[in-house]
Amino acid sequence: MAKPEQEFHQPAAPWTAVGGLVRGIWTRTLADDPATGAYTGLLRYEPGVDTSPTGMRAHDYWEEVYLLEGDLTDPRLGEMFTAGMYACRPPGMEHGPWRTERVVVMLEIRYKATG
Protein backbone atom coordinates (compact mmCIF):
# COMPACT_ATOMS: atom_id res chain seq x y z
CA MET A 1 0.00 0.00 0.00
CA ALA A 2 1.20 3.51 -0.75
CA LYS A 3 0.22 6.86 0.69
CA PRO A 4 -3.31 7.69 -0.48
CA GLU A 5 -3.93 9.96 -3.43
CA GLN A 6 -5.35 13.22 -2.10
CA GLU A 7 -6.25 16.41 -3.96
CA PHE A 8 -6.35 19.68 -1.99
CA HIS A 9 -8.63 19.31 1.02
CA GLN A 10 -8.93 20.23 4.68
CA PRO A 11 -7.25 17.40 6.62
CA ALA A 12 -9.67 15.69 8.99
CA ALA A 13 -7.10 14.03 11.24
CA PRO A 14 -7.09 15.47 14.77
CA TRP A 15 -4.08 16.87 16.58
CA THR A 16 -2.80 14.09 18.87
CA ALA A 17 -0.55 14.58 21.89
CA VAL A 18 2.87 12.97 21.55
CA GLY A 19 3.48 10.77 24.59
CA GLY A 20 6.64 10.72 26.66
CA LEU A 21 8.45 12.87 29.18
CA VAL A 22 7.74 16.20 27.48
CA ARG A 23 4.23 17.66 27.35
CA GLY A 24 3.02 20.22 24.81
CA ILE A 25 4.02 18.47 21.57
CA TRP A 26 1.27 17.53 19.12
CA THR A 27 1.20 15.71 15.78
CA ARG A 28 -1.31 15.68 12.93
CA THR A 29 -0.98 13.01 10.25
CA LEU A 30 -1.57 14.21 6.69
CA ALA A 31 -0.66 10.96 4.89
CA ASP A 32 1.10 7.76 5.84
CA ASP A 33 1.90 4.27 4.66
CA PRO A 34 2.37 1.92 7.61
CA ALA A 35 3.80 -0.77 5.33
CA THR A 36 6.80 1.36 4.29
CA GLY A 37 6.98 3.87 7.14
CA ALA A 38 6.48 6.78 4.74
CA TYR A 39 4.82 9.63 6.65
CA THR A 40 3.85 13.26 6.12
CA GLY A 41 2.49 15.29 8.99
CA LEU A 42 2.57 18.41 11.08
CA LEU A 43 4.30 18.86 14.43
CA ARG A 44 3.16 21.55 16.85
CA TYR A 45 5.12 22.64 19.92
CA GLU A 46 3.37 24.80 22.49
CA PRO A 47 5.15 27.82 24.01
CA GLY A 48 7.62 26.83 26.73
CA VAL A 49 8.36 23.31 25.49
CA ASP A 50 11.83 22.07 26.46
CA THR A 51 12.86 18.63 25.18
CA SER A 52 16.15 18.65 27.14
CA PRO A 53 14.94 15.77 29.39
CA THR A 54 14.88 13.49 26.34
CA GLY A 55 18.31 14.64 25.11
CA MET A 56 19.45 14.39 21.52
CA ARG A 57 17.41 12.29 19.12
CA ALA A 58 18.31 10.10 16.14
CA HIS A 59 16.00 8.02 13.96
CA ASP A 60 16.31 4.97 11.71
CA TYR A 61 14.61 6.86 8.86
CA TRP A 62 15.18 9.95 6.73
CA GLU A 63 13.49 13.01 8.18
CA GLU A 64 12.78 16.27 6.39
CA VAL A 65 11.43 19.19 8.38
CA TYR A 66 10.25 22.61 7.19
CA LEU A 67 9.60 25.21 9.89
CA LEU A 68 6.27 26.87 9.04
CA GLU A 69 5.73 29.04 12.11
CA GLY A 70 7.70 30.11 15.18
CA ASP A 71 11.26 29.27 16.12
CA LEU A 72 13.21 26.52 17.87
CA THR A 73 16.33 27.03 19.95
CA ASP A 74 18.94 24.28 20.14
CA PRO A 75 20.68 24.89 23.49
CA ARG A 76 23.42 22.38 22.66
CA LEU A 77 24.43 24.29 19.51
CA GLY A 78 23.41 27.72 20.79
CA GLU A 79 21.41 28.31 17.60
CA MET A 80 17.89 29.43 16.81
CA PHE A 81 16.02 28.05 13.80
CA THR A 82 13.21 30.22 12.41
CA ALA A 83 10.18 29.96 10.13
CA GLY A 84 11.23 29.25 6.55
CA MET A 85 14.21 27.09 7.51
CA TYR A 86 14.55 23.48 6.34
CA ALA A 87 16.42 20.38 7.55
CA CYS A 88 17.07 17.05 5.80
CA ARG A 89 18.41 14.43 8.22
CA PRO A 90 19.74 11.02 7.21
CA PRO A 91 19.17 8.01 9.46
CA GLY A 92 21.31 8.24 12.60
CA MET A 93 21.85 12.03 12.50
CA GLU A 94 21.62 13.43 16.03
CA HIS A 95 19.54 16.57 16.59
CA GLY A 96 17.95 18.51 19.41
CA PRO A 97 17.08 19.04 22.15
CA TRP A 98 14.75 21.99 21.44
CA ARG A 99 13.25 24.87 23.38
CA THR A 100 10.35 27.08 22.31
CA GLU A 101 9.14 30.46 23.51
CA ARG A 102 6.06 30.58 21.28
CA VAL A 103 4.01 28.21 19.13
CA VAL A 104 6.04 26.27 16.57
CA VAL A 105 4.51 24.41 13.61
CA MET A 106 6.61 22.20 11.31
CA LEU A 107 5.93 20.05 8.26
CA GLU A 108 7.60 16.67 8.76
CA ILE A 109 8.28 14.04 6.08
CA ARG A 110 9.75 10.64 7.00
CA TYR A 111 10.80 7.68 4.89
CA LYS A 112 13.00 4.62 5.27
CA ALA A 113 16.39 4.43 3.60
CA THR A 114 16.45 2.23 0.51
CA GLY A 115 19.26 0.40 -1.08
Where would I find each of the regions flagged by the language model?
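A short, N-terminal "cap"/entry segment at the start of jelly-roll beta-barrel domains
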Residues: 1-39
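Short, well-ordered beta-strand segments in beta-rich or mixed alpha/beta enzyme
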Residues: 43, 66-72, 105-109
